[in-house]
Amino acid sequence: MFINRLTGGFMSDKVTINDIAKLAGVSKTTVSFYLNGKFDKMSEETKNRLEDVIARTNYYPNTIARSLNYKQTHLIGVVIGDITNSFANQIVKGIDEYSRQKGYQMIVGSSGYSLDNERRCITGMAAMGVDGFIVQPTVHFETMWKEIGIHKPIAYFDSPNPVSNELWVKTNNYEAVYDATEQLVQEGYEHFVIITADPYILETRMERNRGFTDCLDRNKKSYDVILADEKTTAAMLEEKLVPYLKSDTPTAVFVCNNWLLDKAYLVLRNYKDLIPNKIGLIGFDSLEWTELVTPSITTIVQPAYEEGQAAARILIDRIENQNQEVPNWILHCRINQRDSTKRNTK
């Protein structure tokens, strides 16, 4: 027996389709339609309610996973942290193009870096019968994955757990940020400010922060940290950042997330006469606007498209029981130095 997390009552060890129908307040036929991906005559409210009940009771892995293991749908479930940013767009493009070449289609979900949303995406996609998953995981994803017990191939990208035995592909974030920070030190910047989203949600963010701080500690340089999130406006960022810009000390601003770079630029363009000699600016990813503005902005460019292709390749190889590809890939970023960090010290 176990306690139903929805009602607090007791249920049998084996959750049945009748239990799901009762908890969701729908018929067994409606549950069956949901499990088979037939949503055309189903309201969004009903769909969401069933998704929630199935996720909370772990119904899928305990009852239908085994039956789905024996048929192939040529569907791949892709879970992205934030599908709106340019990095994610290129990742998805890489996954899609490689998958289509191999006869697969993808279903994409955005988790918003929430473990609960990751669970919902995974269980919902599993109910549709996907052959495997490609996931940008939060730091606690692997624990959840083991708990729900879905026996499907999975490939991590961008933020793999370093002790995971699963497939993964990532970029060399630590080394890239360390090298870029070292370049800033060599340019003559003496103080540093890092603007970052919560670094403890994604392994990638932690690697970038470690690369930044390790380099500065080694060079005995001072630095400050500004935390921001999706709700941070340019005005809010200005209030935090400007106090660090009033010193005569050459200061470099490192923006760790591509979706924060435009906000940092809006703040710093009011000081563009001081860029790059007094103020430096560096960010992440190959954003088109960064080379069009004056001064142009130095960026660390990730091979996002190639990372998406690699993730699809190693997953499909696993699905099809092939061993042609190395199961773990580390791709290299490059530093695209532009005017925002080229100090004229001569």
Identify the meaning behind each predicted range.
Residues M1-T73:
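N-terminal helix-turn-helix DNA-binding module of bacterial transcription factors
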Residues F10, E44-N48, T57-G124, M128-G132, ...:
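Amphipathic helical "hinge" segments at domain boundaries
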Residues F87-Q101, A176-D179, Q183, E203-S222, ...:
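Short, solvent-exposed amphipathic alpha-helices that sit
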Residues V135-D179, P199, W259, D285-I297:
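Flexible loop/hinge segments that line or gate small-molecule binding clefts
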Residues A180-Y223, P327-K342:
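An alpha-beta-alpha
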Residues V242-K346:
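Flexible loop/turn connectors
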